[in-house]
Amino acid sequence: MKNIPYQQNAINELTDKTIRLLNLGGKRHKIVFEAPTGAGKTVMTCQALANITDELKERGDSRYQEVAYIWFAPRKLHLQSYASLKNAFGETRKLRPVMFDEIDQSEGIQPGEILFVNWESVNKESNVMVRENESFASLYEIARRTQEEYDLPIVAIIDGGCKLNCVSKE
C-alpha cells in the first residue's frame, strides 16, 4: 500500500475505534467508514484488519487477543473482495480470507479468518445461508460456535456496495 496520509489516518482511526469497541464488550457496536469511489476503501479496510489483528495480540489491555471477521457484500462483489484480500494476505498469511465452503462448519470461523458472504444469500427470500439443512450449518450456527466455543468476537464488515440494498432484517 502506498503511504498516503489520509489513508494512513483512516486506517489508524478505524483500528483504534474497533479495538475500543471490542474492549467494551456487548454486541452490535457500529462504525461507519465512508470514502469516495476510488479512495481505496478495500485497501484501507484490509490494512485496518491486519492492524487490528496485530494490536489485539500486542496490547496487554485488550479484552480479546484474537478476532474473526465476516465480510458481507452484494451481488458478486464478495468474490472480488475475497480475491483482493486473498492476494493481499497471500504472502504474510496474517489473515485468512475464506468462502463458506472452505471453513470447517462444525467448528466455526477460526481466529484471523475473514468469511466472505454474499448479502443476498442471507437477506433474500431464498436466504440459503441462514437455513439449517443436512449438508450445511447455517451462518447463525457458525457464528454461535465461533463466539461460544472459541470466545471470539466477530467483526462484521458490510461492504459499501450494500449501502442502499443491505438493510437489516431485525
What is each residue range found by the language model?
Residues 1-170:
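RecA-like P-loop NTPase motor core of helicase/translocase proteins
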